[in-house]
């Protein structure tokens, strides 16, 4: 972000560098300011390429071996960037990181913002279908959808953000009927958090993995404190769980921090944390061949961690 800000001094974004420099000390309002800063400084394909590569490198430096990036295609009339160009540029960034020898396997979920409406959602699904066929397995799914059934029919994996706010029971039941391949956040799914036992049963019956983003939930104030986080509920049930960062740069976190937070909050042992990481391979959207390769990597790394 600092690189892009330096390249565009004419933008004069109020308090931009101050917000960026605050890092982990950002307030909720400052996290939302970060979203606005990102949109203002990423208007060209070269901006998208830079930020894609930087994010991948940061994850690689953190020891992450498999990454599913999520990004919403954007068009920018002022620069001529189209949604197709946007996706192509993200894919180019992934390709360049691979060519540079980074020890990380990166895939892409093309995201849809529900607020954009069904027409835009359909366009994005169509774009995702095309890249599913042409990206040599890099595009593996869709994050959210105006009409999620279209996604499933196209062979794309589907991650749905569900129950991020309370009192969404009817909508949640409908969407769980698809069912999605993973649930994002799911903050209010369970009955102890304004959800319902029926919804919990649906999630369990379909063995739908839940993605947990503790730092994001705390900073966005959907969860009051770490010890109240819904990870504890689902983990106690032995339900499939995946620890994630949500928007890494915005919420100033990394995957190591998310694992550390969960371990400290719920008093999990090193062995339990290992199992959590290893089992998450089962829930990625890449092929079985990729899963097998990752399991081999994990098994090679394990002895050094438990000596």
Set out the residue ranges of the language-model regions:
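Metal-cofactor-binding active-site regions of metalloenzymes
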Residues: 1-156, 164-182, 186-307
């Amino acid at each position: 972000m600092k690189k892009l800000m330096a390249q565009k001094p004419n933008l004069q974004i109020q308090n931009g560098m101050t917000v960026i420099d605050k890092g982990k000390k950002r307030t909720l309002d400052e996290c939302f300011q970060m979203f606005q800063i990102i949109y203002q400084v990423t208007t060209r394909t070269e901006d998208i390429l830079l930020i894609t590569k930087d994010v991948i490198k940061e994850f690689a430096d953190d020891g992450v071996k498999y990454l599913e990036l999520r990004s919403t295609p954007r068009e920018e009339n002022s620069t001529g960037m189209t949604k197709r160009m946007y996706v192509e540029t993200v894919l180019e960034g992934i390709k360049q990181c691979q060519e540079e020898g980074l020890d990380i396997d990166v895939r892409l979920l093309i995201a849809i913002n529900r607020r954009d409406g069904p027409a835009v959602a359909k366009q994005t699904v169509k774009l995702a279908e095309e890249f599913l066929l042409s990206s040599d397995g890099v595009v593996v799914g869709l994050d959210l959808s105006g009409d999620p059934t279209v996604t499933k029919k196209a062979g794309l994996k589907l991650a749905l953000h569900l129950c991020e706010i309370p009192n969404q029971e009817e909508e949640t039941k409908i969407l769980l009927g698809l069912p999605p391949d993973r649930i994002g956040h799911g903050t209010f799914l369970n009955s102890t958090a304004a959800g319902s036992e029926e919804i919990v049963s649906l999630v369990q019956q379909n063995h739908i993995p839940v993605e947990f983003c503790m730092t994001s939930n705390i900073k966005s104030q959907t969860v009051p404190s770490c010890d109240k986080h819904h990870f504890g509920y689902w983990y106690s049930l032995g339900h499939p769980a995946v620890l994630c960062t949500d928007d890494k740069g915005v919420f100033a976190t990394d995957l190591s921090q998310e694992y550390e937070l969960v371990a400290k909050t719920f008093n999990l042992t090193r062995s339990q944390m290992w199992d959590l990481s290893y089992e998450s391979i089962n829930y990625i959207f890449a092929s079985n061949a990729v899963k097998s390769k990752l399991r081999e990597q994990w098994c090679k790394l394990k002895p050094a961690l438990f000596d």
